[in-house]
């Protein structure tokens, strides 16, 4: 297997077309029964000291699987002829769940039932092509190699396929396939600053122009700017759905219960995800166009962000900001762009050209020395300059 010095992992989702949908459900049910068995065994075996994942796998298999010596084991696996890699996938998932339970003090009782998606290790899948794959499935009586048709996504031109997961939802089956993709540039932010690469600083407005990008060169001079619009479209699309949701509540009731109007809540989530993906992709594409290898974002305090989101309207573009930031981080790394977060202190109160105090009026600013312009672009410039100054100070 080829090794990449720098890589990113992305997940491609495919819709599964398969005649025997009951086989998919039976395979998942068996997987979760085995998972629960090993979850309980792990908690009994390692109540205090927790070994590493590989060591836990070895010990749990020793306790449950008869070896070559044919000697009885303390806790034999209740199921017969379970494929090796199917069992190991369940053990690793059980180990992760048990460690999570032991690490938390808030969960009083261990989990009684699992509904995890099945992870197929090598040996449980084969013959993957653009639109088909073979999975080893349990039909209730025996294991069968089954050919599944896939729809809805493409195969990356480069990279390595990792273990797929079968995800069953209420009305469909999906196959989620992680791909390890090579990253062309894995240098640190300091190495890029030393090489005098351009930087792109971004501030979020929560308005129709939801993000403002500013390109600075190594000397701090502004080279370009980009205003990303679409916040009003997002708010309008959400408003249409929330109005229908409110009417449905009046007629059918249900309060805040998401299941009462599940299709409306799903549409809201889809709209949110669509615009977050769209805006983050525009920022990354702009960085690539301007050859900016560092993306500077304002640092967000989690508690403060929750206060702002609580105060914002339910259709406000402000609600997109956390999702855009999250997507920017992994999309930037995939493109060989490194993300740096800088504190926002004073970026909105001084002029980016002379450092004098400014007065704000709507979306514009005016400084004591007569400089004026868009205040969000001024903030983005100050944020980028603060990044450059910070690296320069630590280099001295």
What are these regions (language model features)?
Residues 6, 130-134, 145, 172-176, ...:
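Broad gene-expression machinery/nucleic-acid interaction feature
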Residues 54-172, 182-183:
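Acidic carboxylate diad motif detector
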Residues 12-16, 123, 138-140, 153, ...:
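Generic structural motif
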Residues 175-396:
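Positively charged, helix-rich recognition surfaces that bind polyanionic ligands
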Residues 2-18, 142-152, 226-230:
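Generic detection of short hydrophobic beta-strand segments and adjacent strand-loop junctions
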Residues 32-50, 99-106, 253-256, 291-295, ...:
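Residue-level signal for secondary-structure boundary elements
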Residues 1-92:
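Gly/serine-rich nucleotide phosphate-binding loop at the start of the catalytic core
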Residues 34, 89-101, 377-387:
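Stable alpha-helical structural segments in soluble proteins, enriched in small hydrophobic residues
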């Amino acid at each position: 297997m080829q090794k990449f010095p720098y890589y990113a992992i992305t997940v491609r989702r495919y819709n599964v077309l398969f005649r025997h949908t009951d086989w998919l459900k039976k395979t998942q049910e068996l997987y979760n029964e085995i998972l629960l068995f090993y979850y309980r065994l792990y908690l009994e075996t390692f109540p205090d000291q927790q070994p590493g994942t590989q060591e836990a796998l070895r010990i749990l298999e020793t306790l449950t699987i008869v070896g070559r010596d044919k000697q009885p084991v303390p806790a034999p696996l209740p199921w017969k002829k379970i494929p090796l890699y199917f069992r190991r996938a369940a053990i690793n998932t059980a180990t992760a769940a048990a460690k999570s339970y032991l690490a938390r003090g808030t969960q009083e009782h261990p989990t009684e039932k699992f509904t995890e998606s099945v992870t197929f290790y090598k040996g449980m899948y084969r013959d993957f092509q653009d639109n088909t794959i073979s999975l080893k499935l349990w039909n209730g009586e025996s294991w069968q190699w089954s050919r599944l048709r896939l729809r809805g996504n493409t195969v990356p031109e480069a990279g390595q396929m990792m273990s797929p997961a079968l995800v069953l939802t209420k009305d469909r089956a999906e196959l989620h396939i992680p791909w390890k993709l090579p990253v062309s540039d894995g240098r640190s932010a300091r190495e890029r600053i030393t090489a005098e690469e351009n930087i792109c600083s971004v501030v979020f407005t929560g308005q129709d122009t939801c993000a403002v990008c500013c390109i600075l060169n190594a000397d701090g001079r502004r080279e370009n700017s980009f205003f990303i619009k679409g916040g009003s479209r997002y708010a309008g699309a959400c408003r249409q759905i929330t109005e229908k949701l409110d009417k449905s509540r009046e007629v059918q009731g249900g309060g805040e219960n998401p299941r009462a109007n599940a299709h409306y809540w799903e549409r809201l989530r889809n709209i949110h995800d669509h615009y977050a993906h769209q805006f983050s992709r525009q920022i990354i594409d702009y960085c690539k166009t301007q050859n900016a290898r560092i993306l500077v974002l304002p640092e967000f305090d989690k508690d403060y962000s929750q206060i702002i989101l609580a105060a914002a309207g339910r259709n406000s573009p402000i609600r997109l900001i956390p999702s855009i930031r999250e997507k920017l981080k992994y999309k930037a790394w995939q493109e060989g762009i490194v993300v740096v977060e800088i504190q926002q202190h004073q970026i909105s109160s001084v002029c980016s050209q002379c450092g004098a105090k400014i007065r704000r009026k709507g979306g514009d600013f005016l400084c004591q020395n007569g400089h004026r312009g868009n205040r969000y672009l001024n903030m983005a410039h100050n944020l980028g300059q603060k990044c450059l100054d910070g690296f320069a100070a630590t280099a001295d």
